[in-house]
A protein has these predicted regions:
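Hydrophobic alpha-helical membrane-insertion segments
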Residues: 45-62, 141-157
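Hydrophobic alpha-helical transmembrane segments of membrane transport and translocation systems
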Residues: 153-155, 159-214
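Helical hairpin unit composed of two closely spaced alpha helices linked by a short loop
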Residues: 102-112, 116-162, 169
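Short helix-loop junctions at transmembrane helix boundaries
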Residues: 35, 56-92, 158-182
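Pore-lining and gate-forming transmembrane alpha-helices of multi-pass membrane transport proteins
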Residues: 43-51, 82-83, 87-99, 145, ...
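Structural signature of hydrophobic alpha-helical transmembrane segments
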Residues: 11-24
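Hydrophobic transmembrane alpha-helices
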Residues: 48-52, 61, 92-109, 155
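Single conserved hydrophobic/aromatic residue that forms the stacking wall/gate
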Residues: 2-14
Length: 214
């Protein structure tokens, strides 16, 4: 008789745990900042969904491009860790993407929720549709700036590796097809997608909860 463990049923345990940590961090952080009001609930839900979207996007991109956690530069040290612990080092790359995107997603979620709440407090006759449109209009500018923040942060973290590869006089084709570039693109796209989709999701939830309080 075969005995199945939780890891056999759901193999992405490290990734799942990182999502749980991100959600719990969001609940505690936003709760301490804004209290547990409808505004905070909107921000928490929007952030949680945005983080899950970033995780799914990273996994999908990694599978399509053949990128795993074993393609990072510190794989020798990580292999030693993996042999002596139960940590699944192949998922650490994607767990890191979730954690690194959390700050930007949380910032956008709270900003959109606060904006809609303030607009509604100013004019409580506004409909849910009007509040949603206002949230989208405000979030449109935030998408670009927060996406740039994520991309520059990822590039800055990998600048030494990029310079080393450039110093070896690799062709642009070799450089563009390297795992380093692929990982940076994956991080930027997945994190940016999480930020972009957090805006309409949070705006929808916040406008619904604001009107529902009447």
């Amino acid at each position: 008789t075969e005995i199945y463990t939780g890891e056999d049923i759901f193999p992405y345990t490290t990734l799942f745990r990182s999502i749980i940590v991100a959600v719990l961090t969001t609940i505690v952080t936003l709760g301490l900042l804004g209290g547990y009001s409808s505004k905070t609930v909107s921000a928490i839900l929007g952030t949680a969904i945005g983080v899950v979207i970033a995780a799914v996007a990273a996994m999908a991109f990694g599978k399509a491009a053949g990128i795993t956690g074993y393609n990072v530069s510190d794989i020798e040290a990580l292999n030693y860790v993996g042999q002596n612990t139960k940590i699944k080092i192949g998922e650490l790359l994607f767990a890191g993407i979730i954690i690194s995107a959390l700050g930007a997603v949380m910032d956008v979620g709270m900003s959109i929720a606060s904006t809609i709440q303030e607009i509604y407090e100013t004019d409580k006759t506004l409909s849910m549709k009007r509040l949603f449109v206002s949230g989208i209009n405000v979030g449109r500018d935030m998408m670009g700036t927060m996406t740039n923040t994520l991309i520059f942060a990822y590039v800055g973290g990998a600048i030494t590796t990029l310079v080393i590869n450039y110093a070896y006089d690799l062709s642009y084709r070799q450089l563009a097809n390297s795992y380093v570039i692929g990982i940076e693109i994956m991080q930027g796209l997945s994190g940016s997608l999480g930020v972009v989709l957090t805006v309409p999701i949070t705006a929808l939830i916040a406008s619904f909860l604001a009107v529902r309080k009447k």
